[in-house]
Amino acid sequence: MGGRQTRVMTPAMTPEPTDDSPFSYADPGDPLWKRLAIGMVERLSGARHIERLYREKQAEGWRDGEQRSFFHTAISALSLDVQYDADRLVRAPSQGPLVVVANHPFGVLDGIVMCALMERARPDFLVLTNSVLMRAPEMRARMLPVDFAETREAQRINVASRAKALDHLKDGGCVVIFPAGAVSTSPDWLGRQPAIDGAWSPFAARLVLSARAGVLPIYFPGQNSRLFQIASHIHPNLRLGLFFHEVRRRIGAPFPVEIGEAATFDAFAHLDRAVLLTHLRALVYGLAGDAQPRPR
């Protein structure tokens, strides 16, 4: 692709080693049966292998005296070939309120690659993400947790994260959001149709309008396996358990990222929230061009 370059992510500070493991979607607050079910599928589908790769690469960095970020270490451990247009990333606003919006086809890989890119473009970024990932101490400084449990505590966490996101933008910072909240899924029970994001949260548009922020659209081509698509229609626990299977499938693979042109708030000032949300989604999926993901 013309102008596209493969970049190695720039090392950044990382905290001391820890025994805490971010390599599971089983929430300690879930019922025992649910944690066991998710954990069993994860063990069978490669979570331990991925954790071992990460820990080995992390230890290499400490032995060599390198200070790598969690995101850089994860990309290196998985041998991901992250491909993107470096010129477009450089053109992203380096200061001032900026909302980065993206589709969510894979899961944790979307977040890891996105954060690695933002370390280069906007070191002041925060990302709204699944609260389960807060178990990784290396990620906590960047994360604004979103809890999907239907509890008062989850509601409290989500309200606080949204308030922090708005405050950060109003202070001139950058916030990353995957407005679908959940990973893209094929509407077909047999996974024959392309996976696509579900309905986007209006909060993405609210962030832009309330903070008078610019927007940077990013599109991740591709989708998870047909097995994942089928499992998603069978049971949510089976779906959760397969996320690390999907990560393992992509070890050593190209990981293309389509970066759009940033737009200033003036381009959206006249739009109401509903229209803006539709426009934001169109900006992201408009980067797909003719390369639509196909089930594999």
Language-model regions: role of each:
Residues 51, 99-155:
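Catalytic core of membrane glycerolipid acyltransferases/transacylases, capturing the structured
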Residues 94-99, 141, 256-258:
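Glycine-rich, often proline-containing surface loops adjacent to acidic residues and nearby aromatics
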Residues 2-101, 111-113, 120-122, 164, ...:
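Membrane-anchoring hydrophobic helices of lipid-metabolizing enzymes
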Residues 72-76, 136-137, 247-250:
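Short, conserved catalytic or adaptor-binding loops enriched in Gly and charged residues
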